[in-house]
């Protein structure tokens, strides 16, 4: 069965975007050096929030996920969307069902923070790859904010890179039982 994956870069102080919602601070770091191309080959479908979709789509370059179905969590029409991109109006569960029907490969929860947190809190995430980038932003969009549960993670590896980036891999334990709502 396809794994649902959480693959994200974060500043050392825990932000995935700066105070303006930008990820420009990641520009000096070439994702290909950290295994991004291999990761993307393992992924058959993607799920992302509306703001993440708009941010990626507004860059003006070729759509980076061509050939892979992308499900955008949105209650509104996406307007001009690349081929293979569709809006999902009923939330993460519906998006995951659609993604599982579309591929036998892994599913990537791209972001943003709300989508990633929702998938984690609802017990959908199987594997987490978190890249700690040697930058401190001071403020911005937190990786996880006000998490409603305690989640046990099983350490599955660490990899460091010459530029100071560190990749942490965790398997999400399914042993915690029902999700603790606060």
Roles of regions detected by a PLM:
Residues 1-182:
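Enzymes that bind and transform nitrogen-containing heteroaromatic metabolites
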């Amino acid at each position: 069965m396809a794994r649902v994956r959480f693959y994200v870069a974060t500043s050392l102080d825990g932000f995935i975007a700066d105070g303006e919602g930008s990820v420009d601070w990641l520009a000096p770091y070439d994702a290909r050096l950290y295994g991004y191309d291999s990761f993307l080959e393992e992924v058959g479908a993607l799920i992302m929030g509306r703001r993440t979709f708009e941010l990626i789509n507004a860059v003006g370059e070729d759509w980076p996920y061509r050939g892979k179905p992308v499900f955008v969590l949105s209650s509104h029409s996406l307007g001009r969307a690349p081929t293979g991109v569709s809006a999902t109006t009923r939330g993460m569960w519906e998006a995951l069902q659609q993604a599982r029907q579309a591929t036998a490969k892994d599913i990537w929860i791209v972001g943003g923070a709300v989508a990633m947190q929702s998938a984690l809190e609802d017990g959908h995430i199987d594997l987490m790859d978190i890249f700690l980038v040697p930058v401190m932003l001071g403020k911005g969009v937190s990786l996880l904010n006000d998490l409603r549960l305690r989640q046990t993670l099983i350490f599955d590896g660490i990899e460091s890179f010459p530029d100071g980036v560190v990749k942490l891999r965790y398997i999400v334990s399914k042993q915690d039982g029902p999700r603790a709502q606060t």
